[in-house]
Amino acid sequence: MKCPYCGETEDKVIDSRQGKEADVIRRRRECLSCSRRFTTYEKVEDMPLVIIKKDGRREVFNGEKVRAGMLRACEKRNISVHVIDEFIEQLERDLRETGEKEVPSHQVGEAIMNKLHELDDVAYVRFASVYREFKHVNDFISELKYLLKQQQKGGK
């Protein structure tokens, strides 16, 4: 580490402790050249989570974009924003825990679809109509038939 006083790079660590944030380490150092002390902070570099879109474009995961889509689907439904926000936080954690730096968008979309299916069928169909790019009324009918079949099986 370069000494802020004399510019030398040789130093020794006198003290290390966890910073106020759990992902930061605070180190007290002493320059071996001028004997002055200084503090440094180490933090793990955040690796951006990249989503691979259908057309091959890559985009950094944006929880706000997911939130906006889910809120649109859940509009005028009895689903709290808190539930949506918790889901998005968990989704991002789950995606990061895979260890993959890049995740296909369909993996994110399907996770959202599964959560909405669990929460509210109307919100699910609304989201599905955009996510699956429904073009005709028959697309809605097919999805509704699927939901009815799931309900008859005892899925909901």
Swiss-Prot record:
A zinc finger (unnamed) spans 3-34. InterPro entries: ATP-cone_dom, NrdR-like_N, RNR_NrdR-like. It comes from the Bacteria. One of its GO terms (molecular function) is DNA binding. Signal peptide: none annotated. Keywords: ATP-binding, DNA-binding, Metal-binding, Nucleotide-binding, Repressor, Transcription, Transcription regulation, Zinc, Zinc-finger. Its cofactor is Zn(2+). Pfam families: ATP-cone, Zn_ribbon_NrdR. Belongs to the NrdR family. This is Transcriptional repressor NrdR.
